Curated annotation (Swiss-Prot):
Example of a GO biological process term: fructose 1,6-bisphosphate metabolic process
Role this protein plays: Catalyzes the phosphorylation of D-fructose 6-phosphate to fructose 1,6-bisphosphate by ATP, the first committing step of glycolysis.
Activity regulation details: Allosterically activated by ADP and other diphosphonucleosides, and allosterically inhibited by phosphoenolpyruvate.
MF GO annotations: 6-phosphofructokinase activity; AMP binding; ATP binding; fructose-6-phosphate binding; identical protein binding; metal ion binding; monosaccharide binding
Positions contributing to ADP binding: 21-25, 154, 185-187, 214-216
Annotated family: Belongs to the phosphofructokinase type A (PFKA) family. ATP-dependent PFK group I subfamily. Prokaryotic clade 'B1' sub-subfamily.
GO CC terms: 6-phosphofructokinase complex
Taxonomic lineage from the root: Bacteria, Bacillati, Bacillota, Bacilli, Lactobacillales
Binding site for substrate: 125-127, 162, 169-171, 223, 245, 251-254
Binding residue positions for ATP: 11, 72-73, 102-105
Residues engaged in binding Mg(2+): 103
Subcellular location: Cytoplasm
Protein name (database record): ATP-dependent 6-phosphofructokinase
Amino acid sequence: MKRIAVLTSGGDAPGMNAAIRAVVRKAISEGMEVYGVNHGYAGLVAGDIFPISSKGVGDKISRGGTFLYSARYPEFANLEGQLAGIEQLKKHGIEGVVVIGGDGSYHGAMRLTEHGFPAVGIPGTIDNDIAGTDYTIGFDTAVNTAVEAIDKLRDTSSSHGRTFVVEVMGRNAGDIALWAGIASGADQIIVPEEEFNIQQVVKTIDDDFKKQGKNHHIIVLAEGVMSGDQFAQELKAAGNTSDLRVTNLGHILRGGSPTARDRVIASWMGSHAVELLKQGKGGFAVGIHNEELVESPILGSAEEGALFSLGEDGKIIVNNPHRARLDFAKLNRSLSR
């Protein structure tokens, strides 16, 4: 394999630039040429493809976001979009692709491989919700950003004797809420993976103020449960009498310079992705399990360890989906009382 491409797709995540840098420099060290694709699959279809040199990634490891830009491009799920992208790959003489992103990005990589273009996936999303890996690029930075913000909110919360609901990203997974909640000493953590009783939440708030003598209360809420504003309304309807404020950390969690861990993991994964292409292992994704690099086929059966399989209706099924550490929720309950 003499020429490969790299693209980022879906939501941006701190550490994506470190992964791109590793792909470029590892590939060049192996005698390959590397091309970047701007704006993900949309840029692939449009032919927004250009050569990248080792010097071109020299100052990127510390930068957040992705200098290749990113976009969601659902049209790539259609055969027409896939064939248009493949035509551009052929036009540029590209023989393999590294795709950095989440589940949707992996689906695109799977389709490219099915059409004869080897593609390897690298998990890049702050939500940490990808099957086949314990850890996704951007998660550590997002958690640290959330903790820093919650620590500051605690200062103002305790100054005024208030309850704060802090909404964090996590549409399908509560990992950011769990990790940030524990690290910041939150009083309650609400995640999609665990049922909650709104009356019990209100009782815990009351007990903290009236029985425990606390002068503030912090609730970390994953967005996949409901919005912070809706949660506040439900608290009020359930009888909450404390002075309540809602803060949505939102997209701030995606920004900022990546942590050392995100930079190292991204570099490790990026380098290994090139090794997989070199070995002809298209259709695989890189991951981390028990602090070791692992690789999983993107499409196949659950028994084969594949990330996805196809149902009888042709719809994509997630095999062994990522599960949040709910034992962390139990840990937080024991530490916050």
